[in-house]
């Protein structure tokens, strides 16, 4: 915790402003005031950051490196003020200087270096590692542009570049002296030197990987870890003036542009060859730079490379960083001169892998020809890994060629990254109990029966510091007033709140806090969308990436059905509802973008129909990102977690809503099952097919969406409404959704679960009428949410996978 008084803070802030901008504070604009505040807070952090690194180097603690293509950090100023313990001092000091802290905080651009749950999980994990005094650091890419900025124009998603670095980034420090060379293409020459086979990489394209370090501040514990993001630059920044002078302008800039494209944007479109190549380049780029940097740092502060696995743990977040396995092998073999056996032992013991999906589209594989041309030495190493591994399979599964072919790392013209990740790591974990069981018994059963000890579960978590303390300060204060502060450092102590739920004054205050948060969100919605919403209505919220398996379509069809009922019976006995959606569709994913348009057209129709718009309204918010989620989640009454059972690995928004006192309506998918186990069946609303039923349909067939539709007049009507011009004069506008549900037999069982979903929504309507009962349910969810803190998750990773057990003071 930083020790500073208000007057000292004011003095430091004034000095920093003058130093940065060369004028008095009263002459500055808000952007300049934000830059001065951010720079000052970073200055406060730097000395602790240096001390933390010094301590790690001196004590020889095991270092954990978390590799991820995504880090969805959001805004950092509020995090740092909270974790340093100076938010109140800062707020009061700025108030005396006629500066509104919240207004200044809102000027910070979200660091949107992620697409959704994968990147947000990585950010939560970094926060927990620092707060638990674990020597854990992030490794990723410093994208010049984030995923994209989403605008809804004429009901359609329009993608604009997310230029998050436009105003600079006050938190990062460029470490040019720590840059690494990453090699692409070229040829591998082999030779025997002293009776040993050697490999020399020639005629390659060199790329300079330059690290930018961002501090990760632990909660009031004087620990600051590091997020290192790599930026691609030409090896020489000298401009090719001779080519330019000769008029060869394209040659002068083409190399620079091709290199900088590597760290230009998250997830370039990969439906064409060049896009696939760029993605593969990105993955090797940050993995190679990161592994080289780790080994270099290890050798500087330790001695024997043979003991690397005792001092270093490398964790790969999904399959994107899987090339860490052959890259570490390359360094150990080619640069350190280790034998294959020793290098393989160290690599396996060092690397662990989290699987995040069972969707086939997300299990990466790369064409051999592309891979071999771009990464010739890495391909040679993977070939050798595969040959030795397949020999093991041949000895174990004699004559079972289909199984061996299925399990091989190289097959059918592709390099299979998930197979490589399993074979080359010592631990493979799923992210919820159901997900892990599906991996073990179905999707990766061949590997589980070969390597049962590798597989384990680590249910995801969220940092309660951001998603409760920061996002919902009034609820946090109620919790402190009723159960004390211990839950801040021991989140499972939230369970003590259950003992307060017989106190009607506590329930009343819970309701008041929710109402205040709803009013705050309603103001934001009016500001951005010019839609007035009733804060006495149920705020029914589904905010997440738009994807068929997440079933925003099911939610939308339910709203269309309710609209039909209200038009026919305006006196229908329902509590008014506001349906709130937010989420981005991948630029190349037409069905998801079409779903956004459907939601917006339905919203347009309902919100302009005076017969019903005092009962229901629909809002689709633009540009979903962390800072927007922080406003929506505390205001939600109902959390829609309605993915097709078996398809959502875990989910984390379900945990955020739960912690903020929303009731979950859910399928028995991912972590929803574990939420149900914690709160009990009376405090969550469950519907739909279970895992066994879904898996049975997948295995044996027998599902006909036409039959389901033809037996339900409500479904027939809403299905026809998709193509009869009701929501768009172009009757074919939503035909792809219609055909996805009926012609192509409804892959994600939207129609099958429709009736069960409507029955569950009726239950919501009934329960909400009993205010005390509803508030008690909210309180039970809050009380049982502590187990879903990422602190619990990280402790399990540290002790069960990484072998990092150093958890120090204040805990």
Task: Name every feature range the model reports, one short phrase each.
Residues 1-811:
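A conserved ligand/cofactor-binding region detector
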């Amino acid at each position: 915790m930083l020790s500073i008084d208000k007057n000292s803070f004011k003095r430091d802030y004034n000095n920093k402003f003058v130093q940065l901008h060369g004028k008095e504070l009263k002459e500055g604009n808000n952007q300049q005031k934000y830059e001065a505040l951010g720079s000052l807070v970073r200055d406060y952090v730097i000395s602790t950051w240096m001390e933390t690194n010094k301590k790690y180097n001196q004590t020889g603690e095991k270092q954990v490196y978390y590799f991820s293509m995504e880090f969805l950090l959001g805004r950092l100023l509020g995090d740092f003020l909270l974790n340093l313990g100076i938010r109140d001092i800062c707020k009061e000091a700025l108030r005396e200087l006629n500066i509104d802290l919240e207004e200044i905080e809102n000027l910070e651009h979200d660091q949107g270096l992620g697409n959704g749950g994968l990147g947000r999980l990585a950010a939560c994990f970094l926060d927990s590692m620092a707060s638990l005094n674990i020597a854990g650091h992030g490794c990723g890419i410093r994208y010049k542009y984030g995923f994209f900025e989403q605008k809804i124009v004429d009901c359609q998603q329009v993608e604009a570049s997310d230029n998050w670095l436009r105003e600079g980034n006050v938190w990062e420090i460029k470490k040019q002296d720590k840059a690494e060379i990453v090699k692409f293409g070229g040829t591998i020459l082999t030779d025997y030197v002293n009776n040993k086979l050697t490999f020399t990489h020639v005629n390659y394209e060199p790329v300079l990987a330059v690290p930018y370090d961002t501090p990760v501040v632990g909660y009031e514990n004087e620990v600051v870890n590091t997020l290192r993001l790599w930026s691609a630059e030409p090896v020489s920044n000298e401009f090719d003036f001779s080519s330019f002078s000769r008029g060869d302008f394209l040659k002068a800039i083409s190399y620079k542009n091709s290199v900088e494209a590597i760290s230009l944007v998250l997830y370039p479109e990969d439906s064409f060859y060049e896009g696939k190549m760029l993605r593969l380049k990105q993955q090797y780029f940050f993995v190679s730079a990161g592994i080289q940097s780790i080994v270099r740092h290890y050798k500087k502060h330790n001695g024997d490379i043979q003991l690397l696995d005792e001092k270093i743990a490398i964790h790969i977040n999904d399959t994107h960083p899987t090339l860490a396995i052959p890259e570490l092998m390359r360094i150990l073999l080619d640069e350190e001169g280790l034998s294959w056996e020793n290098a393989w032992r160290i690599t396996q013991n060092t690397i662990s892998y989290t699987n995040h999906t069972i969707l086939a589209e997300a299990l990466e594989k790369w064409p051999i020809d592309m891979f071999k041309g771009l990464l010739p030495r890495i391909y040679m190493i993977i070939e050798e890994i595969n040959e030795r591994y397949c020999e093991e399979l041949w000895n174990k599964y004699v004559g079972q060629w289909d199984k061996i072919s299925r399990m091989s790392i190289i097959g059918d013209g592709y390099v299979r990254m998930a197979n490589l990740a399993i074979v080359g790591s010592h631990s493979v974990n799923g992210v919820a109990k159901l997900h892990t069981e599906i991996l073990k018994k179905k999707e990766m059963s061949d590997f589980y029966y070969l390597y049962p000890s590798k597989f384990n579960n680590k249910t995801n978590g969220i940092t309660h510091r951001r998603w409760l303390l920061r996002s919902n300060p009034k609820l946090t204060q109620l919790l402190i007033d009723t159960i004390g502060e211990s839950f801040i450092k021991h989140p499972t102590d939230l369970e003590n709140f259950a003992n307060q739920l017989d106190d009607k004054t506590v329930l009343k205050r819970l309701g008041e806090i929710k109402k205040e948060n709803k009013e705050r969100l309603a103001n934001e919605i009016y500001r951005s969308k010019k839609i007035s919403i009733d804060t006495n209505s149920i705020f029914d919220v589904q905010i997440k990436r738009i994807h068929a398996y997440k079933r925003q379509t099911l939610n939308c069809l339910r709203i269309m059905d309710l609209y039909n009922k209200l038009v026919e019976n305006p006196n229908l006995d329902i509590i008014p509802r506001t349906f709130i959606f937010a989420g981005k569709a991948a630029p190349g994913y037409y069905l998801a973008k079409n779903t956004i348009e459907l939601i917006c057209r339905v919203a347009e129709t309902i919100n302009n129909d005076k017969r019903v718009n005092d009962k229901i309204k629909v809002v689709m918010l633009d540009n979903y990102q962390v800072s927007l989620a922080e406003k929506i989640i505390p205001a939600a009454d109902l959390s829609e977690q309605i993915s097709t059972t078996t398809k959502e690995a875990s989910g984390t928004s379900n945990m955020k809503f739960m912690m903020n006192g929303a009731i979950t309506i859910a399928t028995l998918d991912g972590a929803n099952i574990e939420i149900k186990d914690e709160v009990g069946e009376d405090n969550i609303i469950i519907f739909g097919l279970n895992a066994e039923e879904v898996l049975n349909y997948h295995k044996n067939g027998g599902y006909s969406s036409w039959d389901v539709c033809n037996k339900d007049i409500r479904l027939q009507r809403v299905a026809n409404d998709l193509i009869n011009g009701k929501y768009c004069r172009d009757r074919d506008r939503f035909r792809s959704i219609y055909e996805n549900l009926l012609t192509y037999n409804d892959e994600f069982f939207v129609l099958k679960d429709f009736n069960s979903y409507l029955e569950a929504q009726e239950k919501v309507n009934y329960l909400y009428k009993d205010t005390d009962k509803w508030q008690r349910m909210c309180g039970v969810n809050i009380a049982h949410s502590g187990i879903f803190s990422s602190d619990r998750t990280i402790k399990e990773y540290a002790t069960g996978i990484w072998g990092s057990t150093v958890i120090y003071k204040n805990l």
